[in-house]
Amino acid sequence: MNILMIAPEPFFEPRGTPFSEYFRIRALSALGHRVDLVTYPFGEDRQIPGLRIFRSWRPPGIRAVKTGPSGAKLVLDAFLFLRVLGRMFSGQYDLVHSHEEGSIMGVVFQKLTRTPHLYDMHSSLAQQMGNFQFTRSRLVIRFFRIIERISLKNAASVIVICRALYDQAAAVTAADKLTLIENFLDDRPACTDEGRVRRLRESFGTGARTIVMYAGTLEPYQGMPLLIDSMERLDASYSLVLVGGTAEQVADLRRVLAARGLAGRVVLLGRQPAADIPAYLRAADVLVSPRTLGTNIPLKIYSFLASGVPLVATDLPTHTQTISPDIAVLARPEPEAFAAGIARAAGAAGKEIAARALDFCRRNYTPERYQELVAAALAKAVAGSPRRTG
């Protein structure tokens, strides 16, 4: 099939949804399909057989876009829609595959051309408004909830990335249109170079202390206040290494740590190349996911589980819909409980849990399984549309 994919993100940048889009395209390519990707004017080109990238025009004064909703994103989406319209009238497509708020553009494409529409629902658009502290306006939140409902009702097929989104979508549209595809793929090879891992640990300057590591964005919903409060409950034999965050976020956090007397126990590395993350994970003694808001599974969880390093995560639906106590230490989102979870993971129990997690990933999170699920979602899109494709 010839597929038009709408991605209102900077493709490719090493963060949540672009990672997911990348692996969707990889799977579609392996299945023999051709993809025309319409995306933002930022990001790295990726070479995948059958992929063509069409970037929207860059609005004056906008040179980047942060994670989550923003005023800049609204402007970029308007320019993206113009690019989508251009492709709609210049290309022949068998399917339109939309991501996130691009779903409403997919609905327009579907209505005007009778092309089957596959909606890739990575999150609740309405919930994002609160998670990213973008707005508390009931009117704005209601607007995005309406967009979400229109997209769900009109799509011939819907991909959801976690059980919470599945339940939410099933309350709006037919459950037989839904396909649950967790974002478990990661094509970065595991780090087996022990010398490199040792040098990384030495570069942290933490000496013989137990290294607790978080790798990911520093957005409000990720739970940094909980993690910092938990570090205060642990003795000085523990150090925290934070990988990720913008320069501004890192500077703000550095000031907070200095004010609380923790600057000497926390290493702030900022963003690191995506290809290097497996080595950083292996350099840790304990990995943490202190997320406190939202219901989506953090994409980073899958690489954490596959790292061979014990994981501590908050005992909230964002984690528990996928993670069991058999493969991670689950702790209440309270400083004392989370600190106790870190201490437990640093001991003998942590090694056993990490081994079970690694085995679980090897058995369940395979490229073959992922490709089967993508093929199933495509089949539903074709079967559920009045226009049949070939």
Residue spans of the language-model regions?
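A charged, aromatic-enriched C-terminal amphipathic alpha-helix characteristic of glycosyltransferases
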Residues: G347, K351-A379
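Nucleotide-activated donor-binding/catalytic signature segment of Leloir-type glycosyltransferases, i.e.
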Residues: A251-A275
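Conserved donor-binding/catalytic core segment of Leloir-type glycosyltransferases
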Residues: L4, T206-Q222, I228-M231
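Carbohydrate-associated surface elements
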Residues: A164, F184
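N-terminal subdomain of nucleotide-sugar transferases
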Residues: M1-D45, L226-L234, L316, G390
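Acidic donor-binding loop of glycosyltransferase active sites
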Residues: A156, R265, A279-N296, V309
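Conserved acidic donor-binding segment of nucleotide-sugar-dependent glycosyltransferases
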Residues: P325-E336, A343-A349
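Membrane-proximal helix-turn-helix segments that form the acceptor-binding/catalytic region
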Residues: F23, L82-F89, I104, V108-L112, ...
